[in-house]
Every structure is written in structure tokens, then in C-alpha cells.
Amino acid sequence: MANMTSSVSASQVAGELASATFEEIPALVEHYREDPRQQVIKACERALKRHAKELAERERVNGMYQLMHELGGDGVVVGVDEVGRGSVAGPLTVCAVCLPMEPRIWGINDSKKLTPARRELLSVKIAEVATAIGFCHIAPADIDEMGMARAIRTAVAGAVADTGLEPDCVLLDGNPLGAVP
């Protein structure tokens, strides 16, 4: 280590590691790995932990894209997610989205597993890259009249139709539906 301790403060190193991108972390940790300062050692440990967590997340998302490719091949795959469950929870809303294989959207997940802030951020990213998006809303009174199972089927079919696509495969919460609704 070439006199690193005198040229860069431990706080600066910690800040650099904290703001590093996923791609930058390995090289930065390697660069600072022999720095004996406790603050730098801890910052490297935190960065490596963050990198490992992000790597696991990217592997999960890559698995979703791989499933999408396996099920749809070169055809059209539409992912569907629903929110709301009947008159107690309000209306049922279903969104159908067709995403290209690239660019990958890291962090994409079932809406119920995301914080409101993360949902908002991802909705912007999805809107930027989606080849098609469709929605369907079912009012609470209609859900009560037709029943939840039929309301979900109706909303999924409506959202898929709203995309304007004829999908080869539809995924509901990441699971393939037996047949296109």
C-alpha cells in the first residue's frame, strides 16, 4: 500500500465504499484491503456484505428472466400482478407487463414484497423499458357479485387484453398460468 493512509482519510474511503456501485465494489475493496484503519476495515466489510446481497438479488432476478425465456422462448411473455382483494380491501386492480430480456430490471418483485418507495421507483423503470402495459380494474360491488376467483380471472384477462398483445405465456406473480386467459 503506497502511503494510502496519509493521502485519503478513513472517512473519505468509507464514503467512497458506501456510494460505490455494484460493479465498483470488488475493485475498491481490493484497493483498500490492506489498509489497517478500523473504519476502512469496517467499510470494506459493509461494502462486501452489500455486494453479496445485491449479487443474490441479481441471481434471483436472472432466474426470473430465465424462467420467462424457458416458458416463452422467443414468443411473447406477459407478467401479471394484482392488488386489492374484494370489498374489504377495495377494488381489484391487475397490471400486465411485457418486458424485453434486456435491460434487466434489478429488484423487480411481487408488489406486496416491495416498499411503497421501491414500488414507485420500479414502476418508472418498468414504464421506460416495457414493450406493453395493460390494466384492468374491478369495483368492489362487481367482485361481490361475481366472486373473487371469477373477478381475478376477469381482471387478468382484461389486463392482458389491454396490452394489445397475444401472449404465448402469462405469468401471475411469477408463476405460469395453465393457459392464456
Positions of predicted regions on the chain:
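Acidic (Asp/Glu) carboxylate-rich active-site/surface patches
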Residues: M1-V78, E82, V88-P181
